[in-house]
From Swiss-Prot:
Classification lineage: Eukaryota, Metazoa, Chordata, Craniata, Vertebrata
Name of the encoding gene: alpk2
Task performed by this protein: Protein kinase that recognizes phosphorylation sites in which the surrounding peptides have an alpha-helical conformation. Regulates cardiac development and cardiomyocyte differentiation by negatively regulating Wnt/beta-catenin signaling.
GO-annotated cellular components: basolateral plasma membrane
Residue spans of biased composition, Low complexity class: 1211-1221
Protein name, UniProt field: Alpha-protein kinase 2
Region (Disordered): 23-65, 211-231, 1211-1259, 1303-1365, 1386-1423, 1437-1463, 1937-1966
Species of provenance: Danio rerio (Zebrafish)
Length: 1966
């Protein structure tokens, strides 16, 4: 063989080699002559080594070529047979590759799998020095002959494929090229990478070896091709390059190759420069049968690979933390690509010897031309993996024989093609070099691999971003169920279903990227793991992000390989930090989040993608906010923009939902919502940044496409078999599903914790009562069930529902085809839903027969007809919010949670006065935004059956949906009682069409004679005045028309239900009346039970008797001025329908047989919106109906709202009847023995005017004798009975209450003159008798009212305007009836008069005498008086009415100026006497302690401490005793002295309003007195805190009074300590300021400013200066942190680990990644505990989630004491255990308080929420005590709110809001954990808590053990006393209820012996 030296000065520095050099190139180790030249199937290369070989290879020398090392680390291969250097000898220059080369090994003789070790191929950037990676093939004689036939087929196929591309001249060289391909298969470097699955027969290899040996003759010259072949060869080369690309792109088995060849770059050449390749489509579609065997994708970084391409699922390639180049990647991939099923021959492509290609321009051109075809053909074969070689060993002889002639032709190439051929082959060479990588990456391709062409673009920023390929939708959904479709989205890529799509593998550049980018890449790639692949536990093994490494985390290991069956059943992802997920995507749909247009940082992608894409399971719970508190690169998840209304890309029908699960991955609210039969096990994130409505809304939208017109999403936790049937074509199935879904009407905006939802009925139409019972008892696991004792009673009223006929359902669908009732509520519903609800049937043992226990509202404990009588019910009546009235006020529904049964002793009431002022206080400006305008009507529903959902954001609601309910009589078993849940929505709900209203009558037209319908109910339809539409958008629109099956067959008898559905149309925000027959309105009227079985008088607003109240004809109603619903008891066989004001859309409507119902005029009602119960006012309903108190229960009438307060009822009408026109707003009604029907005006008139209507008033006048003993003696607001241990409280809010709005039923109307409001009718049978006692009520109240009427000559319309101005003010009024109707024995009254006369000197100016005289005269006439019905018609902010004509006319001007102490607060119910201290001053609420004392002084009397008994004769009787009146009377401080006194204690005593009853003679003496004008200042501005501009360290507290009388004194106090006192203040503006110098934590507390002048003292409310306010005023005033600490200490490097939680935070806890930081710690600790010391420290470096450099922190070092001979290792372990335990305890308590806060948010007026700060585990490697905890430093007064026994131990903080909320939190946790876990040691600064402890039961709680003794739980249970926050949360008292016996109807009540209920804890307060 000859070789000539080429000219090295050629531009390309290339070598042209003859064909003999193919076998002798240094790039491929020559084959030993004494060994066979064929390769074993199972062994490829065992002797790889880098160049140059240190040993001389004799075989290499035999070839005539010698490798010569050069100084530039290159090798020049010289031919040893050269005659001269300048001749045509061969010199090959190549780069020396020192990297480890590919090692190809065979696993065993029996396997066909090729196994490749990882090796690196160093890529050379020099275009002239391409690295030839040597592969030494050890010849063997084994199994190559087994695929002889396959090889022949492959060769034939190759011939057919590429023969057409060549000219006739080139065809002559075909056999030569084939032979060379066979040689190249064995010789070239990368044969290992492409030889997978290819087997060569020994015969073929022998033939090839012979051919190679024959070509090594040194004397054989090159053959030179003629010029005729130049053009043909060039075209052939181009065409062959195109074939190369095309074959790679159209591979049948590797469809992903089509994108790889687009950007192929080989040195300076890219494929795009040669061909403009578009995305080529694969011509095959993978069948589904291939999927289970081939889907096994494992994407690793920075290079990608597929593991186990054909079912191989246990060979996970672990990623190294070093970037590798493409060659290494290629070889790494190959080792896992061996497959036992790879029986098709994959042509082995090897990197050809570079010497074959590098031919200079001066060499033979024919060689280049023909060699190009060979090379490109080989390239084609390397890329065309799927093609089969058609010709194998049968052509070997022809190949061998034609080699020499072929080489001769190549040596004669013409120079005309030199340039073109040279350039082309350079490019081809480069393509081949890159083609190796492409070919190997092509092996990664799956036939079902999703498109992942550019996932790495976010990490390898230096790599050009490729455009997203267009993705086609799958042909049909069933494919999705069987095909795995993970969809991993990055900022510039999308994965799609791979069925019939052109998928491409992303190209990974070998660019060294940062750790953050690498982490991000891992995150984005690992989520594509397929079902058959093991969990990728080690993807982020050694990554580092933002100074945080993952290497410190131990490598988690999967427990076992999951089979397909396991994945389908368990779907358990293994989520390591920062990389993560096993995505079982079976059944996934292609609805995925696309974040392409969201420019986010890498860390955002890490947190959003990593933690949310793992949720795309078909059965795995939602994990929408796993990364809630993680921070990376100064980015926290909470900073991510909230997505308001995420939308899915398309809507799904219910059929689709059944077959294909649809995960919708949102950035912060992702959910897998398969609504039919899905596994409802959701992960609830405590700090969910968005509301659940944003999660649910997309599903609602998707469900719109369903063929079901009404929402059929069944979210109740029932048997999935009952609801999963999605065959919508079957009518019966659809009907049943509709029944279930509508019965389950559940707010789809609350969190999908379906375990708390309650099913309403069962699909089992043939179910029995037992089935219903089991349904209720088993399907509501989180709701306490009724006691065993009363289950039988409950079963009597439960029966299986009546099925809906197909006709009925069809009618429904036809009529409301566009109506899709979405039951979406508000955020508060979400939060309120998780509250704890206890049923009223729970009672304490031994108290069954002790008599009824009444709640704080003075009612029987059961307000609805219970299955057991309320006398035995020992819990409050607010069970699950079921009995909330139909129009339950939206804003105060939280306040109707189960009141705590707190029957405090006198000691506790003493503490209530002193301790609860701030806690209970509520002002109208703090109250709810909208006023209630509806009447409260009770529902005759079983407490344990009906559950009513209320919406809190009703001011914004404009849709209401109401369920219909049937009520059976309690004693009749088998009657169906359906449970209705009402939801409101302000979004997209639709209502029934107007035309549907006409079907109400037919729908409800039942047999009037049906006797089984004993619990008949009217249908109440409400409307809202136009003046309140803005606040009452949430009016109930209609009851749910779809539940036609609720008309039980038993109920209807033989009636035929027409199936026509009730419908109503909204006009504005008001529900119009329902037309059709007489059934025009919805209403609920029930009759009180006729007889009481137990001893206590029942005041339940629900009927217990099966007889309903009678119907009052419409004509009768139209002639009555009493607008309230009053029923004639004698007409018990008919129905009453009333239209009453409806609060904002809450409650349930009940409809029934109302065929004869009459129309009741609309009644609008303003309900006081807040009441804080302290003690019962009476034993029964607060509305003291006379008939309730009589033994004849048949006369009982119950039509009052179930609100337990006096109701304001506004008549909604402009049309007044004659009686209404004649009536005044002071009409009173006495109640003898007859009911009064009431109606005035036309109910159809939806408008309401203030001046145009005159509401009527009614009141009760008859009090039962036995009940009168429990009423207040006087008008005092709070009295305590020492003997009975009962505190009597009258509630108000210092707000004006137009009492005309209230009416009491069963009263006979008595109209009176306008100016005589106190007169009542003489016709009352009991009124005359009662009036004798009532003539001696609190004279000051009479006086005030009379004077008010006298000085009110304005017309009635004006008076009405005054009252109307207050109707938006929520006021709770209970005192009126209680005060005025108390029976006072004459002797006692005389005694009081005597005390008054003797103890009170006669005043000089007896101003009120004349007024009192009139009051007395009017009382003598025997009129029952209601002194305060017209009281408080004016607001404190408004000028008072004109003074009486008998008062000094000069006082009118001051009347217009004087205002109340608190302008923002409406006046209390009792007005001050205008004849007292200035008759026009109706303002100053006087302090409770001294109100009577000041009242006497205002009447120019003197009342000292010594004469207190004479001033309070009525209070010091043996039965009732005022508490804490004698304290500090000399100061005469008004009510504002107390810290935020509760509303119930702020009822003001009006001027001259005496607390005692005065004798008639005294009144006469005072008649002619003229009042003395006294200027009373008022508080213009309450205390406010402002910074001092001059000195940011100072703050100023200021307030303002007006007017400022002369000789006034200003006194500033802090918690009773006088800070400043200024005498004789003279200021025009009335503003007074207190400056606090250098304000610090010591200045925190309650501040108050008082203005004292003469006998008047006016004070502001106590202002609480908290640490939050202090920090806001002082610290932010500086540019730098206030007083930066100059800390001297040691700086050390630490690693912090946060404690993370999974779904169950009690059992699934783990520490996150270590985050490096540096801290500077003081040397001396500032605090010390049992096992730890606290050091102040400052973070100097590092970004922790809650800290930044410079942030003050506290380092707590747990130093365990060394006992005995413990070694250092044991101490370190103990130190670690203590630190870890504290992290677990406090962070677990933090999770509990998060849940507590979510519940507390739903309680209006709850206020600020407490927080437990997180702590972190700190590792200090350089310290002897290596482990500690780190937490935020709390600045301020550190207070222990409660300790382990649950008591509040800090007396200075006895009324602390934080302290009470902490105790309520302890109570809440105790209840939630059923007494098994208690959070103790509640302490901290303000609302931020730390150092908490947890006590658990002995065995722990759910695997969690606390750090406190179990005895703490028992102590808490015994000592905890509920506060107002416990009540707001509906928590039941832990104390045993006191056994009090309510007096039966006896002449005298026997006092109950004293019993200290709560132990000695309050002894100090007594």
């Amino acid at each position: 063989m000859t070789a000539k030296r080429v000219d090295m000065a050629a531009p390309d520095n290339l070598l042209f080699l003859d064909s003999d050099a193919v076998n002798s190139s240094p790039a491929s180790v020559p084959i030993e002559q004494n060994e066979p030249t064929h390769v074993l199937d199972n062994q490829t290369d065992d002797s790889l080594r880098s160049m140059p070989d240190p040993h001389t290879n004799t075989a290499l020398e035999s070839t005539g070529l010698m490798p010569v090392p050069c100084q530039d680390e290159t090798l020049e291969t010289h031919s040893q047979h050269n005659e001269g250097e300048n001749e045509s000898s061969l010199v090959s220059t190549q780069h020396m590759d020192h990297t480890r080369l590919t090692e190809m090994t065979i696993n065993d003789e029996k396997s066909n799998n090729w196994d490749f070790d990882i090796s690196g191929v160093k890529e050379n950037d020099n275009s002239t020095n391409l690295n030839p990676d040597l592969i030494h093939h050890a010849g063997t004689d084994s199994v190559m002959e087994r695929n002889l036939n396959d090889k022949q087929t492959d060769l034939n196929h190759k011939d057919e494929t590429f023969g057409s591309l060549m000219s006739s001249e080139v065809l002559l060289l075909k056999e030569n090229r084939q032979q060379e391909m066979s040689q190249d298969t064995n010789l070239h470097q990368c044969s290992s990478s492409e030889s997978t699955g290819i087997e060569y027969s020994q015969t073929a290899n022998d033939a090839i070896s012979d051919a190679m040996n024959s070509e090594q003759s040194p004397d054989q010259p090159f053959s030179i091709a003629s010029n005729d072949t130049d053009k043909t060869t060039s075209e052939c080369s181009v065409q062959t390059c195109w074939d190369t690309v095309e074959s790679a792109a159209t591979s049948k088995t590797q469809p992903e190759l089509h994108d790889d060849v687009k950007d192929v770059m080989c040195e300076s050449f890219t494929t795009s420069q040669t061909l403009n390749i578009d995305y080529l489509s694969t011509d095959i579609s993978v069948c589904l049968a291939d999927l289970p065997e081939t889907d096994s994708l494992n994407i690793l970084t920075p290079a990608s690979t597929l593991l186990g391409i054909l079912g191989k699922n246990n060979n996970v390639l672990k990623t190294a933390d070093v970037p590798i180049n493409d060659s290494e990647m290629v070889q790494s991939i190959n080792k896992d690509l061996a497959s036992p099923n790879a029986d098709i021959s994959k042509t082995v492509f090897t990197q050809m010897d570079q010497n074959l290609l590098h031919v200079t321009d001066h060499n033979v051109k024919v060689l280049e031309s023909n060699r190009a075809d060979t090379v490109v053909d080989q390239y084609v074969f390397s890329e065309n993996i799927g093609q089969e070689v058609s010709q194998a060993s049968s052509h070997d002889e022809d190949l061998n024989s034609s080699v020499q002639s072929h080489d001769q032709q190549l040596s004669t190439a013409n120079s005309e093609i030199e340039e073109t051929s040279s350039e082309f082959h350079t490019q081809t060479c480069q393509d081949i070099h890159e083609g190796v990588i492409i070919a190997e990456e092509a092996m990664n391709g799956h036939n079902t691999l999703p498109e992942m062409h550019d996932i790495a673009d976010v990490t390898t920023s230096q790599t050009p971003i490729m455009k997203d390929p267009m993705i086609d939708e799958p042909s049909y959904l069933p494919d999705l169920h069987k095909a795995d479709t993970p969809n991993v989205i990055t900022t510039a890529s999308t994965l799609s279903d791979t069925l019939e799509t052109d998928d491409s593998i992303f190209e990974t550049a070998d660019v060294s990227v940062s750790d953050c980018e690498l982490i991000q890449t891992v995150t984005l790639k690992t989520v594509t793991t397929y079902e058959t692949l093991l969990m990728m536990h080690d993807v982020g093994e050694d990554l580092t992000c933002c100074d945080f490494t993952t290497s410190a985390i131990e490598e988690p290991e999967t427990s076992h390989p999951l089979s397909l069956d396991d994945l389908h059943e368990s779907n358990t992802p293994n989520i390591p930090p920062h990389a993560s997920a096993l995505l079982d995507s079976l059944g996934m749909n292609k609805n995925f989040l696309e974040t392409a247009d969201v420019p986010v940082s890498d860390c955002e992608v890490i947190q959003t993608v990593t933690f949310e894409t793992v949720t795309t399971y078909e059965t795995f719970p939602v994990m929408h906010d796993i990364a809630e508190d993680l921070t990376c690169c100064d980015f926290t998840t909470s900073e991510t923009p909230k997505i308001e209304e995420p939308e899915t890309s398309h809507s799904l029908s219910l059929d689709d939902l059944n077959e294909a699960n649809t995960p919708n991955i949102l950035p912060h609210a992702s959910a897998l919502l398969e609504s039919l039969g899905m596994n409802n096990n959701f992960l609830e994130a405590a700090d969910m940044p968005v509301s659940d409505r944003e999660i649910i809304h997309p599903v609602n939208k998707d469900l719109d496409s369903s063929s079901v017109e009404i929402c059929t999403v069944v979210l109740t936790q029932t048997d999935p078999k009952e609801v999963q049937d999605s065959d919508l074509d079957e009518k019966e199935t659809e009907s049943n599903r509709i029944d279930d879904s509508i019965d389950g009407m559940i707010d789809t905006k609350f969190s999908l914790d379906v375990s708390k939802l309650q099913p309403v009925c069962s699909n089992d139409l043939s179910g029995t009562v037992i089935h219903s019972e089991s349904l209720f008892s088993q399907s509501i696991p989180d709701t306490p069930q009724i006691g065993e004792k009363y289950k039988n009673d409950l079963l009597q009223v439960i029966s299986p529902p009546t099925p809906v006929t197909n006709e009925d359902l069809g009618n429904c669908s036809e009529e409301i085809d566009d109506a899709c009732l979405k039951f979406t509520g508000t955020e508060r519903d979400v939060e309120g839903d998780s509250e704890l609800w206890l049923e009223p049937s729970q009672f304490l043992a031994g108290e069954e027969d002790e008599g009824a226990i009444f709640d704080k509202w003075g009612r029987s404990c059961s307000s609805s007809p219970p299955t057991t009588h309320p006398d035995n019910t020992k819990a409050s009546d607010y069970t699950w919010r079921e009995n909330i009235s139909i129009d339950h006020n939206a804003e105060d529904w939280e306040l109707t949670f189960p009141p705590v049964e707190r029957w405090s002793s006198s000691d506790s009431w003493a503490s209530a006065l002193s301790d609860w002022f701030q806690a209970v206080n509520t002002y109208p400006e703090d109250s709810f935004k909208s006023a209630s305008t509806g009447s409260k009507l009770g529902m005759a529903i079983q407490d344990n059956i009906l559950e009513q959902r209320t919406s809190s954001d009703n001011a914004n609601n404009d849709e209401q949906t109401c369920l219909s309910l049937n009520l059976m009589q309690p004693d009749e078993p088998g009657q169906a009682l359906e449970r209705g849940l009402v939801k409101s929505d302000n979004t997209n709900g639709t209502v029934f069409k107007q035309g549907d209203k006409e079907r109400l009558a037919s729908c409800l037209d039942m047999d009037k004679d049906t006797t089984t319908m004993e619990s008949q109910m009217s249908l109440l339809e409400t409307s809202t005045p136009e003046s309140h539409k803005a606040d009452n958008n949430a009016v109930m629109e209609t009851f749910n028309a779809s539940l036609t099956h609720e008309f039980n067959a038993k109920l209807h008898g033989s009636l035929d239900i027409s199936g026509k559905l009730l419908s109503a149309k909204r006009e504005g925000n008001v529900l119009v009346e329902v037309t059709g027959g007489k059934v025009s309105q919805l209403g609920l009227v029930f009759e009180e039970e006729r007889q009481s079985i137990f001893t206590s008088p029942s005041s339940s607003a629900y009927t217990r008797d099966k007889n309903l109240t009678g119907c009052v004809s419409n004509e009768e109603r139209c002639h009555s001025s009493d607008v309230h619903l009053c029923i004639c008891p004698s007409q018990s066989d008919s129905h009453v329908s009333s239209k009453a004001g409806h609060a904002e859309g809450n409650g349930s409507f009940l409809h029934s047989n109302i065929g004869n119902c009459t129309v009741k005029p609309y009644v609008e009602e303003n309900i006081p919106q807040f009441i804080m119960p302290f003690a019962p006012i009476c034993t029964g309903n607060t509305f003291l109906h006379r008939s309730f108190l009589k033994e004849d229960r048949s006369q009982a009438d119950l039509d009052l709202p179930d609100k337990k307060i006096i109701n304001k009822i506004n008549l909604k009408s402009n049309k007044k009847s004659s009686s209404s026109d004649d009536s005044s707003e002071d009409n009173f009604h006495t109640c003898p023995d007859q009911s009064l029907s009431s109606s005035s005006g036309d109910s159809d008139d939806p408008s309401i005017t203030d001046s145009g209507r005159k509401p009527a008033y009614s009141d009760t006048c008859d009090i039962g004798k036995e009940l009168s003993k429990l009423l207040l003696l006087t008008g005092e607001h709070f009295m305590v009975s020492e003997d009975k241990r009962i505190a009597y409280v009258t509630l108000d809010l210092d707000e004006s209450q137009h009492f005309g709005r209230f009416s009491l039923p069963n009263c006979e109307k008595q109209s009176k003159p306008d100016n005589m409001p106190h007169k009542t009718s003489k016709t009352s049978s009991d009124g005359k008798m009662r009036s004798k006692h009532k003539e001696k009520p609190d004279d000051k109240q009479q006086h005030g009212i009379q004077a008010s009427k006298k000085q009110d000559p304005q017309p009635q319309s004006q008076v009405k305007n005054e009252g109307a101005g207050c109707e938006d003010c929520p006021v709770a009024v209970i005192e009126t009836i209680v005060i005025t109707e108390k029976i006072i024995p004459k002797t006692q009254g005389k005694k009081k008069k005597k005390h008054v006369q003797h103890g009170t000197p006669k005043p000089e100016n007896d101003a009120p005498t004349d007024v009192r005289s009139e009051s007395r005269q009017k009382n003598v006439n025997g009129k029952a008086e209601n002194l305060e019905l017209k009281v408080a018609s004016n607001s404190l902010n408004k000028p008072v009415a004109q003074p009486s004509g008998k008062t000094d006319i000069t006082k009118k001007d001051s009347a217009q100026k004087v205002m109340s102490v608190r302008p923002k607060v409406e006046p209390s119910m009792a007005k001050m006497d205008p004849a007292g201290v200035n008759a026009t001053q109706k303002s100053s609420p006087i302090k409770l302690k001294a109100d009577t004392f000041n009242t006497a002084k205002m009447e120019n009397k003197t009342c000292t401490t010594d004469s207190l008994s004479t001033c309070l004769p009525s209070m010091l009787n043996d039965d009732i005793k005022r508490r804490r009146i004698a304290d500090d009377l000399s100061r005469a401080v008004p009510i504002r002295t107390r810290p935020q006194l509760p509303a119930i204690f702020r009822q003001a005593r009006k001027d001259g309003e005496d607390v005692t009853r005065r004798a008639y003679s005294e009144v006469v003496k005072q008649k002619n007195s003229t009042p003395k004008e006294v200027v009373v200042p008022r508080v213009v501005s309450e205390i406010q805190a402002d910074p001092v501009p001059a000195d940011p360290q100072n703050i100023s507290l200021w307030c303002q009074f007006s007017p400022i009388p002369p000789e006034a004194t200003i006194k500033w106090t802090k918690e009773a300590a006088v800070l400043s006192e200024i005498n004789k203040v003279e200021k025009e503006d009335g503003r007074f300021t207190l400056t606090i110098i250098k304000a610090c934590s010591k200045d925190l507390g309650f501040y108050k400013c008082s203005l004292i002048v003469a006998n008047i003292s006016v004070s502001t409310s106590e202002y609480h200066l908290t640490s939050e306010v202090l920090m806001e005023l002082v610290i932010p005033s500086h540019d730098q942190p206030a007083e930066p600490r100059v800390m001297e200490g040691d700086e050390e490097n630490i690693q912090c680990s946060p404690l993370l939680f999974k779904e169950d935070f009690l059992s699934d806890q783990y520490f996150g990644k270590n985050q490096p930081a540096s801290i500077l710690t003081e040397k001396v600790h500032f605090g010390e505990g049992m096992h730890r010391k606290a050091f102040r420290t400052t973070l100097t470096e590092g970004n922790l989630p809650r800290f930044r450099p410079g942030h003050p922190c506290v380092l707590k070092v747990h130093n365990s004491i060394s006992y005995g001979t413990k070694n250092n290792e044991e101490l370190v372990q103990k130190n670690y255990s203590l630190a870890v335990e504290e992290c677990h305890v406090q962070n677990t308590a933090r999770e509990y308080i998060k849940a507590y806060n979510s519940v507390a948010k739903s309680a209006e007026s709850f206020g600020d929420l407490p927080e437990i700060i997180p702590i972190y585990l700190v590792h200090r490697p350089s310290n002897d005590i290596p482990y500690a905890t780190l937490e935020e430093e709390l600045l301020g007064d550190f207070v222990k709110y409660s300790v382990k026994d649950g008591k509040e131990i800090n007396l200075m903080r006895r009324d602390s809001e934080a302290g009470q909320k902490c105790c309520a939190f302890q109570h809440w946790v105790y209840t939630q954990t059923e007494g098994n876990l208690l959070v103790t040691d509640m302490q901290g600064v303000g609302m931020k808590l730390t150092d908490v402890g947890i006590a658990t039961c002995k065995k722990g709680y759910k695997g969690f053990r606390g750090n406190c003794a179990t005895s703490f739980i028992d102590q808490f249970k015994a000592l905890h006393q509920c506060n107002r926050y416990c009540e707001l949360l509906g928590l039941v008292s832990l104390q045993p209820k006191p056994k009090r016996t309510v007096a039966p109807p006896k002449p005298k009540t026997q006092p109950v012996p004293k019993k200290k209920t709560f132990g000695p804890v309050l002894n100090a307060k007594s």
